[in-house]
Amino acid sequence: MRDEFQISLGSGIAAFEAKQFSQAWSLLKPYAEAGDASAQYRLGIMCQIGLGQVRNEQLAYHWMSSAADQGYGLALHGLGQMYLDGDCTVQDEGKALACFEQAADLGLEGAMVALAQMYQQGRGTDKDTGKAKALFKRAGFDPEALPS
């Protein structure tokens, strides 16, 4: 039964990656409702952007935060971006910073860059160019070559 679960979940993820969003929604929704973070994350993206359906901010936040609560790195990064931009939720730079920190700790380079920019600009935290440079370097960028 576990193999069948993985095949069906894999089909939903493949449909998402192939931009077959209506099919992806149908395939992924049961797994998201059962608590699968990868399915929840993808439903969150579809709701946030309006892929295969009308944009739904409340559902976008629900699915993205459900996946993030399980420590799913991409969802932590996505939720951080939602908080940073005030998209699908109230803007909260402190919560954005916390999400990006968790995602960066999981090795997500995009989260490291977002976090570095927050430290560089003093958003949600005190300005700290040393931390910003260290994060840019950890993400694979030459901090000295980046604009300040």
Spans of model-derived segments:
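Hydrophobic face of amphipathic alpha-helices that form TPR/SEL1-like repeat modules
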Residues: 8-9, 14, 42-49, 76-85, ...
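Structural signature of tandem alpha-helical TPR/SEL1-like repeats
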Residues: 17-26, 54-63, 90-99, 126-137
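Short helix-capping/linker turns of helical repeat alpha-solenoids
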Residues: 3-4, 33-36, 49-51, 56, ...
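Canonical positions in the second alpha-helix
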Residues: 29-31, 65-67, 102-103, 138-139
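Alpha-helical segment of the N-proximal tetratricopeptide repeat
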Residues: 4-34
